[in-house]
Amino acid sequence: MIRSVVRGVGSALPKRLLSNREMETLVDTSDDWIVQRTGIKQRYIAGEGETTASLGAEAALKALEAAGLAPADIDMIICATSTPDNTFPSAAVNIQNRLGMTHGFAFDVQAVCTGFVYAMTTADAYIRGGLAKRVLVIGAETFSRILDWQDRTTCVLFGDGAGALVLEAVEGQGTIADRGVLTAHLRSDGSHKDKLYVDGGPSTTGTVGHLRMEGREVFKHAVGMIADVIEQSFAASGLTAEDVDWLVPHQANRRIIDGAAKKLDIPLEKVVITVDQHGNTSAASIPLAISVAVADGRIKQGDLVLLEAMGGGFTWGALLLRW
């Protein structure tokens, strides 16, 4: 049985760090207010010359280096983003160009904060189906460019960045002990589309628009939806919460992260948390968190890693991965 095995990880952050103290000078808020409600202490903001594609390409090159591979070894790029450099071509094609690749194929997946789980699931399907052997899976965002910087309820939450993984097809016995993606479950429910959205687009306003969110509504649904899809992944794999070595959640805010871990009975010692340092980077948050946990030695070969996310739409999903 073919499995999609992680060969390397990488990440990239903009140069500018925006602390809560500096945020106090930009909008009517306070460090205490932000930390108590979200757990966020700082975030990174893209500056001139820094784009979704430039950050994504930087993360991709680091992932390739970690894998001991070159762009020539990759035959597919999939980028999860809601903030591409252009309406078209895709961020993935822009990244492909930055990597000097003229072979293979590249495309974007847009599922907002769940985007990286959707992208990993899609890449795994291509690998299992024999359509790709080595895939760059990237989550990259510049959400700072769609924020309403007068809206203190949203502008304090988000940051920019990118993370990337290299997935490679490996033949194995197909047991739960084998390395690679074990199972993934995706969901969406468009009846909630107006609870977290951007109020613009080429087909409606002809403008980029700004992010709008009903925070209480998002929080009300988040923990239950996340827990439900994770339970589906456990049922499909025969694994349980006790088997999980590391939970890597979408870094939305600390309350949602803590609530999901508690509902699943996963101790916080097993949860990778970077929201305090990165803020909510949407589709980039999971690969950024993975990169941190791999670099500091927490995630090791053989570990069972659980990814989960929820985003606008609503979209949500979970993926179990043997590292």
UniProtKB/Swiss-Prot annotation:
| Pathway note | Lipid metabolism; fatty acid biosynthesis
Q: Where is the active site?
A: C113, H250, N280
Instruction: Enumerate the catalysed reactions.
Output: malonyl-[ACP] + acetyl-CoA + H(+) = 3-oxobutanoyl-[ACP] + CO2 + CoA
Per the UniProt entry, the disulfide pairs are none
- Give the E.C. number(s): 2.3.1.180
UniProt cross-references to CDD domains, sorted A to Z: KAS_III
Instruction: Indicate the principal place this protein occupies in or around the cell.
Output: cytoplasm
Identify one Pfam family in the record.
Answer: ACP_syn_III_C
Q: Which GO terms describe its molecular function?
A: 3-oxoacyl-[acyl-carrier-protein] synthase activity; beta-ketoacyl-acyl-carrier-protein synthase III activity
Q: Where in the cell is it found?
A: Cytoplasm
- What's a single GO CC term here? cytoplasm
Which keywords, in A-to-Z order, does the entry hold? Acyltransferase, Cytoplasm, Fatty acid biosynthesis, Fatty acid metabolism, Lipid biosynthesis, Lipid metabolism, Multifunctional enzyme, Transferase
User: From what superkingdom does this record's organism come?
Assistant: Bacteria
Q: Where is this region: ACP-binding?
A: 251-255
| Record comment regarding domains | The last Arg residue of the ACP-binding site is essential for the weak association between ACP/AcpP and FabH.
Stated role = Catalyzes the condensation reaction of fatty acid synthesis by the addition to an acyl acceptor of two carbons from malonyl-ACP. Catalyzes the first condensation reaction which initiates fatty acid synthesis and may therefore play a role in governing the total rate of fatty acid production. Possesses both acetoacetyl-ACP synthase and acetyl transacylase activities. Its substrate specificity determines the biosynthesis of branched-chain and/or straight-chain of fatty acids.
Q: Which PANTHER family match?
A: 3-OXOACYL-[ACYL-CARRIER-PROTEIN] SYNTHASE, BETA-KETOACYL-[ACYL-CARRIER-PROTEIN] SYNTHASE III, CHLOROPLASTIC
**Which family does this protein fall into?**
Belongs to the thiolase-like superfamily. FabH family.
According to UniProt, the name of this protein is Beta-ketoacyl-[acyl-carrier-protein] synthase III
Q: Give the organism the record lists.
A: Allorhizobium ampelinum (strain ATCC BAA-846 / DSM 112012 / S4) (Agrobacterium vitis (strain S4))
Question: Could you read off the lineage of the organism from its UniProt record?
Answer: Bacteria, Pseudomonadati, Pseudomonadota, Alphaproteobacteria, Hyphomicrobiales
Q: Which gene encodes it?
A: fabH
